[in-house]
Amino acid sequence: MARAVEILAQVYEKNRAARNTPPVPIDRPVVLANEHVVFELGKTTRVQVERAFGVAFAFPMRGWHTYAAREDAERRFLSLFYAESGLVALEYYVPKLAGTPSLSPRDYGAFRLTPGDVALGASTATLDERYVTAVGGPAPVVYAEAFEVRFPGGVAYVMGNGGRVERLGLYTAT
């Protein structure tokens, strides 16, 4: 019995140490794209986005620029954050809070996170091997599942509940 407990403790310690180690970055940027715009951190500008989508609504707080999108007959939010007109953070998600603004959704086309062709509503089980359990990322307060892929200059998160993707995020690494 003591030997079994010792083995379980070793497995736990090994997994705990591995879980706190960030994954090795892939060799190319992760982007969110549709047929109108490719959102790439540090390269996409506010002018490019506003030319394609118009002026955004300030939500969830000052500094964020949010558009309501319609995809698969559902309302989604695309929130962008810029520094000196360049994109530094992006979130594409299914709004979950009761107090979200009643913005009229527009059909911007389907958005996908690449590499991996990850879409909102997709099964988290279909994520490829580049997406690993998130390390030090989103806490499981709103989303029970969080996966990440790191890339030069940033990190991408895929978050969901019940095996379904509900939020995609790109953030500049600091």
Where are these regions (language model features)?
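Short, exposed beta-strand-loop hairpins at the edges of beta-sheets
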Residues: 148-150, 154-162
